[in-house]
Amino acid sequence: MTHSHAQLVWQDGQPMSAVFGDVYFSRASGLEETRHVFLRHNQLEERFAALPPSGSFAIAETGFGTGLNFLCAWQCFEARAPAGARLHFVSAEKFPLTPSDLAQALALWPELEPWSSQLLAQYDVLTPGWHRFVLAGGRVTLTLMIGDVLEVLPQLDARVDAWFLDGFAPSKNPDMWQQALFEQMARLSGPGASFATFTSAGAVRRGLAGAGFEVRKAPGHGAKRHISHGWIATPPDAGWQAPWYARPEPRWRERSAIVVGGGLAGAASARSLALRGWQVTLIERMPQLASAASGNPQGVLYTKLSPHLTPLTRLVLSGYAYSLRALRCLLPEDGDWQACGVLQLAHDGKEAEKQQALAELNLPESVMRPLDRDAASELAGTDLPCGGLFFPQGGWVHPPALVRQLADHPNIVIKTGRTALTLDYDPAQRSWTAGDEQGPLAVASVVVLAGAAETAQFDSTRHLPLKKIRGQITSIPASEESSRLRTVLCGEGYISPARGGRHCLGATFKFDTDDLGVNDGEHAENLAMLAELAPSLRASLDRDAPEHLDGRAAFRCTSPDYLPLVGPAVAARDFVHAYRELARDATLRPATACPWAEGLYVNAAHGSRGLITAPLSGEILASLLEGEPAPLPADLMRAVHPSRFLLRDLIRRKLDPDAL
C-alpha cells in the first residue's frame, strides 16, 4: 500500500519522467497530438454528438500522467455532446504527479484552464486506492485508480466505449505493455468499443489483435510516422461470474427513485441520483432531515486506519478523499465545517505500535504525518501527553448542514414527518409504492433504503443483520484555554475545537438498549475519556456541572463485519432456494441468475464512519443503476454487498429458510 508520486525532471519547462526517461507528451505540441491520436482516432466528436439527451459515454485510459488526455476529452464532450449527456473517464496511474507538479504541467495550456482549474481544485487529496471526482456539476466523472494498471484493471467493473492506450513508450516501460493488459481491455470493452494509441510497435499491434481487436495503422502527428487504432472485433468469453455479485440488469422505465431515510446515507444517495437526472422523493419520518445519528452538532472526518490492507481501511481511504472533495464543493468553510486537521494520539503502547506501522505506509505528508509530543502540543494549541498521527486535511463538520446541502437539488422532493410503513412492488408497471397510514407517499421505479437499522423493517430486508449501538455525545462550554484548541483530538473518543462557544466530545458505545435519553452517567464517561486523552484540556473545562452540559443520543447502525451494506437487495427465500447446493459444496459454480428484489437497493450500516463512507456509497448505487464504471475495485464492491451475509450463512448452514 506504499504510495509514490512521480519523480519529474523539467526540461525547457516541460515534464519528463526521471524513472522512465521519457516525456509525458510531445515536446512539439502535446495538445495537438492528444487530439489527433486519442480524440480523432476514437471518433469522439462524432460519437459525442450522436449521444441521446440522457446518454453516457465511458472512456478508459492506461496512464493518467498530466491529465492532458482527460481534459481534452472533457473539452470536446462539452462542445459536442447534448446538454443532458454524461462523460465517465476512468484512468490508471502508478505514479501520480504531486498537486504542484500537475499545476505546473497544466499551466502550459492556458486554453484548458476552464477545465484544468476544476480538476486542480479537487486533486490535492491523493491517498492510495481509487478516487472519484465529480466535475462540471455532476456531468463529468473521473475515476482515478492509483496503482499499477495490470493490477487495477482486473478489479474494474465497467463497460468501456473508447480506450486511450497511453503510457511511456514500450521500449521505456515494457512492464505495462503486456498481453494481460490487452486482454483486460477486451474484457472491459462494450459493443463497438474503440481504441487509439500513439505507438505502432509490432508487439503492441499483435497483442491487441490476439486479444480480439481489429488493428489499423494511421499517420502519426508531427515527427511520429504511424499510430495505431481500431475496435473490438471478437469480444472474449466472459466466463463464469458469481451471479450474486453481478449487476442487476436495469429494468426501470423512468429515472425515478424513492429514498427512505433523511440522514447522510439517504441524502447522499438522493444527490448522486439527482445529478444523473433522476427524480427523487426523499422520505424522512422525523420533522426535519438529519434528526438521528446525522444530527450531532459536530462530526469528525476521522480516518482510523489499519496498517494492513483490510477492506475497511481501503474503503475509508477512498471515502475520506471523496467526502473532503464533496465538502469543499458543497459547504463554505465557516461555521459548518473546518479543515482544522485531526490528531490521532498514540495514547497507549498498542496504539503507538500501530501508528509506527501506519507511518511505514509512506502516505504523502499532505495526507498523514507523525508528530512527537512537543510538535503535537504546539500544533493543537494545548499541552498533550503524547504525540500521534496528524491528518492535515481532516477536520470537523456540522452534519445537518451537509445533509441539507446534499438534499438541496431541484430533482429532489423532500417529505418529512412521514414514515414509509409499506413498500409494494407492481411487476406489471415495474414500480414501487411507498405508503404510510394515510395512504401512498410516492411511486417510483427504484427504492433505496437508507434508514439505518430501520432498513430491516420491511419484508424484503428482514434478513439483513443490522444492529444498533447507542452513542451519547457531550456538549460543554469552552474555556479561555480550551478555545485555543486548533485541531480535532482523537483517541478512545474525540473532542473538536469549539463551535458556537461549545466543544463536542464523545461518544459512548452502549449495546442492547433502545433508550435514547441523555444521562449524566455517559456525560461522566465522555469527560473521563477526555481526561485520559488530554488531561490539561480537561482540567481547563471548569463549567462541567450537569446544568452546564448538553448532549444528545442516537443509534449508530452497523453490521457484523463493520462494513456498510451498499447495493442491490435480493429476494431472500428465492436466493436460498436458488443456491441451496452451496451448503453442500461451496466450490460449485451455479449458473442460475440471482433472484433480485427488483429495483430495491440498500445504503446502510455506516456505523460511526458515516461522514467517510456514506457520500461515496451514494455514488456506488448511482453507478450500479446507471450502468456506469464502479467507483471502487470489485473486491471492495463485494465486501459491501448486501447479500454477503446471506451467502455466508447459506454456505455455513446457518440459515433457517422458514425464518426468512
UniProtKB/Swiss-Prot annotation:
UniProt region (FAD-dependent cmnm(5)s(2)U34 oxidoreductase), positions on chain: 260-660
Subcellular location: Cytoplasm
Entry EC number(s): 2.1.1.61, 1.5.-.-
Cofactor(s) needed: FAD
tRNA (mnm(5)s(2)U34)-methyltransferase: annotated span: 1-233
GO process terms (BP): methylation; tRNA wobble uridine modification
GO CC terms of this entry: cytoplasm
Annotated family: In the N-terminal section; belongs to the methyltransferase superfamily. tRNA (mnm(5)s(2)U34)-methyltransferase family. In the C-terminal section; belongs to the DAO family.
Keywords, alphabetical: Cytoplasm, FAD, Flavoprotein, Methyltransferase, Multifunctional enzyme, Oxidoreductase, S-adenosyl-L-methionine, Transferase, tRNA processing
Annotated InterPro entries: FAD-dep_OxRdtase (IPR006076), FAD/NAD-bd_sf (IPR036188), MnmC-like_methylTransf (IPR008471), SAM-dependent_MTases_sf (IPR029063), tRNA_MAMT_biosynth_bifunc_MnmC (IPR023032), tRNA_MNMC2 (IPR047785), tRNA_S-uridine_synth_MnmC_C (IPR017610)
One MF term in the entry's GO annotations: tRNA (5-methylaminomethyl-2-thiouridylate)(34)-methyltransferase activity
Main location: cytoplasm
Gene: mnmC
Name of this chain's protein: tRNA 5-methylaminomethyl-2-thiouridine biosynthesis bifunctional protein MnmC
Organism: Chromobacterium violaceum (strain ATCC 12472 / DSM 30191 / JCM 1249 / CCUG 213 / NBRC 12614 / NCIMB 9131 / NCTC 9757 / MK)
